[in-house]
Design a protein with these regions (language model features):
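Acidic, glycine-rich loop-and-beta core segments that form the ion-binding/anion-interacting portion
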Residues: 17-73
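Glycine-rich, charged/polar anion/phosphate-binding loops
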Residues: 25-34, 75-81, 133-136, 164-169
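Short beta-strand elements
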Residues: 6-9, 42-52, 93-95, 109, ...
Length: 202
């Protein structure tokens, strides 16, 4: 009987790379949305040819590699969104205060995928009402009276009602190529971030 096997250390290294890739994909490529669709051909490939000569011999080495790989994957994921056809605005939707990770994720994805929200951004309309509406139907149990929303660093909503920031200031703040929407559910310690863009008529 003949066969080919690899050393246990090689198996371990492949497992480390696989875990690092899985972790990186979770916080990068799986955190972007353009039109809400996904291709059956969507693929992430990481190739390691050993040419660098770098060796991962300690937990600290592995952690440093994981962080570096995650950074590269996140930047590539952002570029996918930024390179979308006829993109006018790149928007980061950051949800905090979730009671569970899934709760924060559902809220962030609902806002980032909402056609109404995305079209308002294209028209330089902050429209926090559409944002809180998307959070409300996201499928997670949220308390509207606890929700705070900041748009481009300005308070748009506090406790589920309009904040004191003048509407003209909010409208001016979103007239930029990129900005962030911060949504605090004020229910827990979990957070989630999704990267998206504005929606225009084709």
């Amino acid at each position: 009987t003949q066969g080919v096997s690899s050393a246990a250390s090689d198996v371990y290294k492949r497992q480390v790379l696989e875990l690092c890739v899985q972790s990186g994909v979770k916080s990068s490529f799986n955190c972007i949305t353009i039109d809400g669709d996904m291709s059956t051909n969507d693929t992430v490939l990481v190739m390691a040819n050993g040419a660098s000569g770098v060796k991962l011999e300690t937990p600290e080495d592995i952690y440093a590699f994981q962080q570096a790989l995650a950074h590269v994957m996140l930047e590539l994921a952002k570029h996918i969104v930024q390179d979308g056809e006829r993109v006018t605005k790149f928007v980061t939707v950051h949800v905090t205060g979730g009671r569970t990770e899934d709760e924060a994720k559902k809220a962030a994805e609902a806002v980032a995928k909402s056609s109404l929200v995305k079209s308002s951004w294209n028209g330089n309309d902050p429209n926090w009402g559409r944002i809180i509406h998307a959070v409300g139907y996201c499928g997670a149990k949220v308390d509207e009276e606890k929700i705070d929303i900041d748009i481009a660093g300005l308070a748009a909503c506090r406790g589920g009602v309009q904040a004191d920031t003048p509407s003209d200031d909010l409208r001016q703040a979103v007239q930029v190529p990129a900005f962030q929407v911060d949504i605090n559910l004020n229910r827990g310690e979990f957070s989630h971030t999704v990267y998206t863009l504005s929606l225009i008529h084709i």
